[in-house]
């Protein structure tokens, strides 16, 4: 725990959009609760958890920056996927209502498949810029990939505390394939405040 008796920490939350969507889909379609993740609830939880870890009054702990990064289809491709455009707009409205800044890159056509490229680099650059400008004291990363390890190491060297919001789960999909989601153990070990959200959520449900 960091003892902070004077200044309220400035919290920045940074979402890997694909990871967040994957986790939200799991809770909406697979988990017994059958409910999507609430961004408002997640931000409230983050504020409370940072306050607890930093040893300050929760009332003085608020998310001041929130950014969402994801690759997405262009309008023409999305229009060919039924209600994709509508659902994208609905989620954009949710992000906007929570004050989350969106950062989109077009999906690339790689060997006939639409794939995401460059969003992890963009996320890392955005976090580093805010850290260098002194706009955040705590970087909350909603990510899972080992690719983010250099970012976390750099933030630690700069004196920025890192909270890692992670999920781990597995299930069998409709095609019978086993889907496994794991967070990089190196990320979990590096972060000042690693949070295993599946345990937090399941514990809250049991209570």
What would you call each of these model-derived segments?
Residues 1-115, 161, 168:
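Domain-level signal for Mg2+-assisted phosphodiester chemistry and nucleotide/NA-binding surfaces
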Residues 89-207:
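Nuclease catalytic cores that cleave nucleic-acid phosphodiester bonds
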């Amino acid at each position: 725990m960091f003892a902070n008796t004077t200044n309220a920490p400035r919290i920045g939350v940074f979402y890997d959009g694909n990871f967040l969507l994957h986790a939200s889909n799991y809770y909406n379609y697979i988990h017994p609760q059958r409910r999507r993740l609430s961004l408002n609830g997640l931000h409230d939880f983050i504020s409370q958890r940072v306050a607890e870890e930093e040893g300050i009054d929760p009332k003085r702990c608020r998310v001041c920056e929130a950014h969402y990064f994801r690759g997405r289809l262009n309008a023409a491709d999305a229009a060919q996927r039924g209600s994709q455009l509508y659902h994208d707009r609905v989620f954009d409205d949710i992000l906007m209502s929570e004050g989350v800044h969106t950062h989109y890159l077009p999906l690339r056509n790689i060997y006939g498949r639409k794939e995401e490229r460059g969003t992890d680099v963009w996320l890392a650059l955005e976090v580093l810029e805010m850290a260098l400008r002194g706009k955040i004291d705590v970087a909350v990363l909603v990510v899972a990939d080992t690719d983010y390890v250099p970012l976390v190491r750099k933030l630690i060297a700069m004196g920025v505390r890192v909270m890692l919001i992670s999920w781990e789960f597995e299930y069998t999909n409709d095609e019978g394939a086993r889907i496994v989601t794991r967070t990089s153990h190196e990320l979990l070990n590096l972060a000042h405040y690693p949070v295993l959200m599946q345990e937090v959520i399941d514990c809250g449900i049991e209570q």
